[in-house]
Amino acid sequence: MHLLPALAGVLATLVLAQPCEGTDPASPGAVETSVLRDCIAEAKLLVDAAYNWTQKSIKQRLRSGSASPMDLLSYFKQPVAATRTVVRAADYMHVALGLLEEKLQPQRSGPFNVTDVLTEPQLRLLSQASGCALRDQAERCSDKYRTITGRCNNKRRPLLGASNQALARWLPAEYEDGLSLPFGWTPSRRRNGFLLPLVRAVSNQIVRFPNERLTSDRGRALMFMQWGQFIDHDLDFSPESPARVAFTAGVDCERTCAQLPPCFPIKIPPNDPRIKNQRDCIPFFRSAPSCPQNKNRVRNQINALTSFVDASMVYGSEVSLSLRLRNRTNYLGLLAINQRFQDNGRALLPFDNLHDDPCLLTNRSARIPCFLAGDTRSTETPKLAAMHTLFMREHNRLATELRRLNPRWNGDKLYNEARKIMGAMVQIITYRDFLPLVLGKARARRTLGHYRGYCSNVDPRVANVFTLAFRFGHTMLQPFMFRLDSQYRASAPNSHVPLSSAFFASWRIVYEGGIDPILRGLMATPAKLNRQDAMLVDELRDRLFRQVRRIGLDLAALNMQRSRDHGLPGYNAWRRFCGLSQPRNLAQLSRVLKNQDLARKFLNLYGTPDNIDIWIGAIAEPLLPGARVGPLLACLFENQFRRARDGDRFWWQKRGVFTKRQRKALSRISLSRIICDNTGITTVSRDIFRANIYPRGFVNCSRIPRLNLSAWRGT
């Protein structure tokens, strides 16, 4: 193992000082408070050292051009600002408890819960010293506008649904040790009587397919997939641990494939079709933990975003970011725009001011940095950046029009009213246009169709399982980014860019035609159809971020490893939660999947349907009529989106949020109109999420209804 010099020094100091030592307590089972204080102090040293080394290491690799695919991914998965503070506090607490448990273990005859031996004052000390202490008390909350952080949406529980809080658990977590270690951590450890397969083996045997088997979806456009990613980035983001080295060993996990917290590498199975060295691995780092509450030490993860459908991907989920995104040079309520480049006279997103920018790696001669938007992942692909650019422009268009109607409004009023309208737009497009095509129109009408009003007892938080389940959209990605000219033709020499050459390529927007060709490609190109024998294209399964190193990542394997990292129960537990049958053998699983060969592959790998990882099990189910998901995903999505609506005090249909005239005006908005109003595109898809081959299904912008803002005059 490679012990890093800087961390080695810290560890040596800790050993010499003999931390976490103290006088044996007088009463059996008790812990001296001085021992607890020593463990907290040691934990802070270890965590801070790991954080600092990792940050310097990633920046050095980016600066030198030796960054790996995981470095690129990690850069955008790193917690920042207030999220980083919350994550650091959780790591302090988890590491301190681990150190204390290690010290007390020789005095115990078997496994024990270390928090059970701490007194209430000691638990409070641990919570306060680590920074985990939270106050969720009633406070005065505005009835007019949302907060940026989502705080105060629920007046009785102001933190419910706010950013930087723990994800909801709809089922108890399942960890190998009952507390934190993911299943698969110990190779010999069985789950429900069977050894778990390596996630890369599952990817190879079930997800992998030859390119000639790829089928385009005759019913859905690529814009359908893209909206799914855009709305997902409105709802959830579970950052990874900021450490890339083991907390207690100082080992660089990417260089050694060491399995030490927070490192959980993806091992390579025999006869892997791409990675020939079985001792190699795909680096993987655990999601940052949330702070344990009370005596519950079972690991959970945080959501860095607000849980509401509120356009936070445009405005941010932290106050500091929201202020950076605003144009502070005037009082017009506008969002900031790029000061160096334009897109045919229209605004582009501002550049982020990263000291060592990963987007520069994708084209060193272009020297175009990453964009700055409300979500840190905005530059992941040009398609996603195009959506962020579109909605930044729409905010500024709304603010400008509102100022024309209300010249006495100040900048904050213009900003807040435009943001409020934007939130309603995202809600309407998602629930009226997108979800019926996900769930099937009849089912969506039955389960999500009628809004009965706000209920303060509804928990709107994003569920841990949703963060994995909503990755169903990965199965709809085509292997190329398509860009079309004004006649919807692929006429340019670079009109079809492989996905593996598009990640973090902000330069392609600046120097290769802006966002219009990308949006046309999303409207006029069909999505990939998810089939049981063709799930995920190799651009994502074998070449993810390959442009900077030989070993690209495997998105399917990452998804399954993440579900184990998060302690998510297996396939049958979630079917039971949804009131669905739980197959026990080959015959029953074959009936559920309507595919005996696939059922046999699953059982050969997992031994029992109980163990099938939620992501792969859910996307393998046959699609419901008119839907793009099977029954399990439909259940999970209905549950989550119903909670996000009914538990939102600022939902657009709630009486008092908008006037009756304003609600009527908002009901006419569409994503097609937003494109018409903010680009040079004059012919758009009328039903934008459905597959339309130009010119069929396309109309002139003059035929798309406009949003009439007269209802906002003088309000």
Curated annotation (Swiss-Prot):
Binds 1 Ca(2+) ion per heterodimer. Its EC number is 1.11.1.7. Pfam families: An_peroxidase (PF03098). Disulfide bonds join 141-152, 253-263, 257-281, 359-370, 578-635, 676-701. One of its GO terms (biological process) is negative regulation of interleukin-10 production. GO terms for molecular function: heme binding; lactoperoxidase activity; metal ion binding; peroxidase activity. The keyword 4Fe-4S does not apply. It catalyses: 2 a phenolic donor + H2O2 = 2 a phenolic radical donor + 2 H2O. Keywords: Calcium, Disease variant, Disulfide bond, Glycoprotein, Heme, Hydrogen peroxide, Iron, Metal-binding, Nitration, Oxidoreductase, Peroxidase, Signal. SUPFAM superfamilies: Heme-dependent peroxidases. It comes from the Eukaryota. Ca(2+) binds at residues 234, 306, 308, 310, 312. The active site is at 233 (proton acceptor). Residues 18-139 form a propeptide. GO terms for cellular component: extracellular exosome; extracellular region; extracellular space; secretory granule lumen. It is found in: Cytoplasmic granule. Residues 1-17 form the signal peptide. Tetramer of two light chains and two heavy chains. Mediates tyrosine nitration of secondary granule proteins in mature resting eosinophils. Shows significant inhibitory activity towards Mycobacterium tuberculosis H37Rv by inducing bacterial fragmentation and lysis. This is Eosinophil peroxidase.
